[in-house]
Amino acid sequence: MKRLMLTLAFVAAAAGTPAFGQQSTGVRVEFQGPGGHSFGAYGRVSALHAAARTVILLQKALPAGSYQITNLTGGNSVNAIASDGIIELKLTARNAKAYDALVAAVTKAAADGAAEENAFRGVKPGDLTAGAPATVRSIVTRF
């Protein structure tokens, strides 16, 4: 019984240390845009280009070793401007507060990546393409 109590006391004390309190889960960043055929819709924003711009921003915003990009995908056809783009990451932080800071940095990078693609194509909030928003938008979710 004494040995069990000592073991439990050690585990309880160790659980408060960074090595045992690590936070590690996945984050999905989704981009949505109008898309279209590359001939008729030339010059429209690309959700996949926004995702690629975000990856570059993530490299600058997140500390080395705190993330892994596990998936980067988008588009649905040859000769088409991608209407969707997805980045999936695994984030690792020493505690919940640091993890929330990483998620906030990912959210900012996603918004900035979409804004860069919109600015590059000259699209402003409120612009429409065939009645739908002409901008690329981003959504960040934890999974």
Predicted ranges, named:
Residues L4-A13:
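Sec-dependent N-terminal signal peptides
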Residues A14-A19:
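C-terminal segment of classical bacterial N-terminal signal peptides
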Residues Q22-F143:
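Midchain, well-structured core segments that form catalytic/ion-binding scaffolds
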